[in-house]
Amino acid sequence: MDRIDSAFSQSSMNSDMLEPDDPRINNKDAKPEQDDEDDLEKNALRQMDYKTRRKHIQQIRIQFNISSLKQRQEFLLKLARALMAFGAPSHRIESQLVAAARILEVEAEFIHLPGVIICSFGDQDLGSSETHFVKCGGRLSLGALHKVHLIYRSVLHDEISASQATEQLETLLVAPAPYSVLFRCFLAFCLSALICPLAFGGSFLDMWISGVAAFILAYLQLYVAGKSALYANVFEITTSIFVSFAARGLSSIRSQIFCYTAISSSGIIGILPGYLILSSSLELASKNIVCGSVKMVYALIYTLFLGFGLQIGSDFYLLLDPTMRRHLEELAASLSSTTSFTGIWLADNGTDGSQIPLNGTWTFSRTIQPQDQHIHEGCYRPPISPWYLKPFPLWTSFIIVPLFSFLSSLSNLQPLKSKQLLVMVAISCCSYASNKIANHYIFNHSDIVSAIGAFTVGLLGNIYSRRMGGTAFTSMVTGVLFLVPSGLSQAGGITASGSGIDIGGAMIAVTIGITVGLFMSQALVYTFGSRKNAAVFSF
């Protein structure tokens, strides 16, 4: 009897704990056991052909740090804003966003125009799309750009979630600049003072004058032009007129202790659109015609403004000093190897008087060639000059080049306490060395010389990125920007010809050579080794 009661109580207890439609009570509704997820994936792979199966296996997926669709879309928008704000290579922005959207499994399309990125997110369930316009302007910031790339790579490697990455990007966007305005003006002073003897043949006195001009220019650019929209429109012309006027006035001193070409060229080196023309050349080489052509035309007009300002400043001083103007005309005539006259030629020793006068232009060559061997990089440097008026010897490049590379990285907002700063300086020094050696053997071809220097930079930067996990773009920027003033000095300087069109043509020749060298080095490095699944963050 006790056994029956216990069995009844056990049965009633089980019936109270289980639902009536539980499969353990009603076996006719029990569902068959589902296959394991691995078995389902194997069955799906078995139905694919070889190429589709291999592509599916190599695809990167987010498995651990999963975020909602809205958070992933916000991350893509914030990433687009950060890349534009910190000066990422414009021809790589669209490919990076597409790679991030593919790995995050977000249906999105991106269109990059100058100053704006159009992001379109699709919804397959509703059959609609949502379009966002990300408008942002900025300048090159190497430290922040390196952090953006680390965040981007952490999300794609499934190390952090999209929501965490969005917060980190927002913190970067609102963070203040690492250096004050006064310190950046001091950096501009040092850079112009160092590039004056290095690339434009300036003397010890010239470098200080060009440094002062660059300090004033940087203060006007960072402080005055940033607060006055009216002055920002005429900033380039006014500063180039001021620098050229001061340089021409100092060079007119009778003892010839200052060089106009060295001071004016190095004084405006901080506002040359070298990076802008380089990015436009890279855009055109990447078949991005809209952005590339717009930036190229803007950079050329910008360069014409600078050339126009330099010419106006020089001519305005010569208008006030006619003696100096006559002296320059006589100097130009004495340096020419030929002399031309236009008129009528008639022989005086004719006997019959029937000679016909000849009308035309007559050119006479000099029997004694002009003494121009003392002109170095457009500056007159006689051997009897004191040490502070002579060009710097070659051994000083071993001191000036690393120092210039170090200060150039700081001026592009690279943090002082970072291991990548040493890599930037090393690559930049290799860039200058290869450029100098190539210029020794190849004459009057600034584009080919710049291509060799850019190939060296690209090779070292991409190998550093592949083998040591660094960011290729930020490590290469200093070396690439070093090639622009070096290439211009090989093309005859910025003010040697006095024409803005010639300056623009020289800059285009240099940047086309840099573009070819960078693309060739990248193609060589990425030909070997495993293929990257994400977009390349390089030039």
PLM regions: where:
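Soluble N-terminal domains of membrane-associated systems
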Residues: 1-163
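Conserved NTP-handling cores and scaffolds of large molecular machines
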Residues: 104, 484-487
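Alpha-helical transmembrane segments and their membrane-interface boundaries
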Residues: 139-484, 491-539
